[in-house]
Design a protein with these regions (language model features):
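N-terminal secretory signal peptides that target proteins for export/translocation
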Residues: 1-5
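Hydrophobic alpha-helical segments, especially transmembrane helices
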Residues: 7-10, 257
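Bacterial N-terminal signal peptides
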Residues: 9-18
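Bacterial Sec-dependent N-terminal signal peptides
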Residues: 18-34
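Glycan-processing catalytic domains of CAZymes
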Residues: 29-374, 380-405
């Protein structure tokens, strides 16, 4: 009898060990023990953190130095395109030395796909293949063929395609349908789009009224397709017709990336690296470094999390958004000043959080909030403190998070 029981115990212990090993090796889909992300993040993180991407601006010859400077401000992925595979391999080698990843292409990727993918796919610095930026709907069949051809040689690395913002792609209310058509046609591991919301017209700063509608639609399609979102902040001042895109302040960068964050973004991008570093760091370098440190600190909460809902407060609500008609559980009162806030309910690891972003990129926001449950307050660097009902100021574009126990 004792030997029989002992054999059963040994068998059960072995089963438990096998199950545990299988769970441990299940990839990145479980962002932490016991929690399954609503989307697959396998191969879409960098050193256990968010991918933070700088777009273009580094020549192959400069990459040995500039990629190290890029990493210094918290950017861990470089995206660029080159004429030859030799340049691509140089950038990959230098990226590995710098400790970053790369999303790259060259002309031959599409004309000699098998050979080029064969040279790139096993390089440890390769994050993804760069396929296209802002394609038209008529490009979708061609992109489908290009992606499938690459995936036939390498299905371990994603193919990167970035989509138009809603204001630049026909009627704003048709945007969701176009994104859905793209994701239905072209195989994608994540959905990337650009929208640079902060602009100046006649010397007056504002953000595009369609911006939050863009985030709403991307979030809706991404949830339906179970795909993570990649979004942008603008780091390069430039002109477009009568619109000026200014050198971004810290408040403007925070507003863009923290709004992306609370809408569920899992990848964060900057256009372009030239706005951050050009032979020497620009005035934007330290601001980007500050924001990136916050993003990685908050990845413990937001990476792989479910964004249950998003609301807006303020005197007027952005087009396509909804107001806070009922309060999240545990909150009995919530009031904000002036421009208002983006409010997001986040669930991860069985824990519930409410994240609040000041939508004003110029001025502090007053936040008056009350609770009927135990609450932990978390700042933009992940530091925690016990909280009670309070009246606080939130700096321009900044974020504050409350864990509701």
């Amino acid at each position: 009898m004792f030997k029989a029981l002992k054999s059963i115990y040994v068998y059960l212990a072995a089963v438990i060990l096998v199950v545990a090993a299988c769970e441990k090796n299940a990839g990145d889909r479980s962002s932490s023990e016991g929690w399954e992300s609503p989307y697959d993040l396998t191969g879409l993180t960098v050193d256990g953190g968010f991918p933070i991407v700088a777009w273009t601006g580094i020549t192959a010859s400069d990459s040995g130095t500039w990629l190290k400077e890029m990493k210094g401000c918290g950017i861990n992925v470089y995206l660029g395109w080159y004429d030859t595979i030799e340049e691509v391999m140089t950038v990959l080698d230098n990226a590995e030395t710098a400790g970053v990843k790369a999303i790259l292409n060259c002309d031959e990727l599409f004309s000699d796909t098998g050979n080029i993918v064969g040279r790139m796919k096993d390089h440890p610095a390769l994050f993804a293949y760069h396929i296209a930026d802002e394609p038209s709907t008529s490009d979708f069949p061609m992109l489908k063929d290009a992606v499938n051809r690459i995936l036939s040689f390498d299905d371990a690395h994603p193919c990167y395609i970035n989509l138009y913002p809603n204001w630049a792609w026909g009627k704003i209310d048709d945007y969701l349908q176009k994104v859905n058509a793209f994701l239905t046609t072209v195989p994608q591991r994540f959905v990337s789009f650009d929208h640079y919301p902060i602009m100046e017209v006649g010397g007056v700063s504002s953000f595009r009224p369609e911006w939050y509608k863009n985030l709403e639609d991307i979030r809706r399609v991404a949830r339906a397709k179970k795909l993570p979102i990649w979004a942008f902040a603008l780091s390069l001042a430039h002109y477009l017709d009568d619109v000026t895109y200014p050198v971004p302040t810290l408040g403007q960068l925070r507003l863009q990336q923290f709004s992306n964050l609370v809408y569920g973004a899992q990848g964060f991008q900057y256009f372009t690296f030239h706005g951050i570093y050009r032979n020497t760091p620009t005035q934007v370098y330290d601001r980007v470094k500050d924001v990136n440190a916050s993003l990685q600190a908050l990845s413990k909460i937001f990476m792989g999390a479910e964004i249950v809902d998003v609301w807006h407060t303020g005197a007027s609500l952005p087009y396509g958004t909804k107001g806070l008609s009922s309060l999240p559980q545990g909150i009995t009162s919530l009031k904000t000043s002036d421009v208002g806030a983006v409010i997001s309910q986040v669930v991860k690891d069985g824990r519930t959080y409410v994240a609040i972003v000041n939508k004003d990129f110029n001025r502090d926001m007053t936040l008056d909030i009350a609770f009927n449950r135990k609450v932990t307050k978390i700042d933009n660097m992940g530091y925690k403190a016990q909280a009670q009902s309070e009246n606080i100021t939130v700096s321009p574009g900044n974020i504050v998070i409350y864990q509701i126990h």
